[in-house]
Amino acid sequence: MEYYRKLIGERIFLAPVRIEDADKFCRWFADAELAMNLTMFDRQMTKEREEAILSDMVKNNSQIFSIVINNEEQLIGSCSLFDLDHSDRKAELGIMIGDKSCWNQGYGTEAIELLLDYGFNILNLNNIYLKVFEYNERAYKCYNKVGFKEIGRHREARIIMGRKYDEIFMDFLASEFTGSKLSDYFK
C-alpha cells in the first residue's frame, strides 16, 4: 500500500501514520538496543496495543508521521509532535528510526527538520521540546546539530543495570528556526 506524501524532503518524506504498520513498529520496539532509547523500554508491546496507541494519538490530534525513503516507499521509522498545547503554542517531539540499517545516515536529522518546519510554520507553534537520555549520544548530537538547546536535566532518571543516567530536556523556539522548506509553497 502506498504512503501519502505530506511533507517532502530531499531523501525522505513524512506520511500520515498507517495503523497497519503497527506490526513493524512492534518488531522494532522488541529490539532492546532501540527500545532502551524510548520512554517505553520497560513495557511489553503487542500489535493490538500499538494499534490502540496509534489510534489514540490520531484521535487526540497528535501529529504522527511515518518516515519513508523517497522513491522506495520503505518505512524506516516514525516521528511526531504530541501533547500539543494550542494555548501556549507548544508540543513535544518524538522520533524513532526503527530500521537500524538507516542509522547514522542523516534520515533522523532530515525528519526532524521537516517536523520543525511543519510545527513552526503550519501549526504555528512557538516552542517544540523533547527529552533524551544522556546515554543516547547519537540522538543528543542530532538534536544539537538541528538547533535544540539543553534547558535542564532530570538527574538519575533512568537506572539500567545499577547505573544511573540523566534525562535531558531540550527545546527549540520558533524565533530560532530559519530553515523553512515550506516557505517555497507560499511565495
Functional labels for PLM-detected ranges:
Residues 99-101, 105, 134-135:
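Active-site acidic-Proline motif in GNAT/NAT acetyltransferases
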Residues 129-132, 149-166:
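Conserved catalytic-core motifs of GNAT/GCN5-like acyltransferases
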Residues 1-51, 176-187:
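A short, well-structured alpha-helix characteristic of acyl/acetyltransferase catalytic modules
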Residues 43-102, 173-176, 185-187:
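Acetyl-CoA-dependent GNAT
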Residues 104-118, 140-145:
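Conserved acetyl-CoA-binding loop-helix of GNAT-fold acetyltransferases
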Residues 121-131:
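Conserved GNAT acetyl-CoA-binding A-motif
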Residues 143, 148, 170:
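Conserved active-site tyrosine of GNAT-family acetyltransferases
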Residues 108, 112, 135-139, 156-161:
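Short glycine/proline-centered loop/turn elements that form peptide/ligand docking sites
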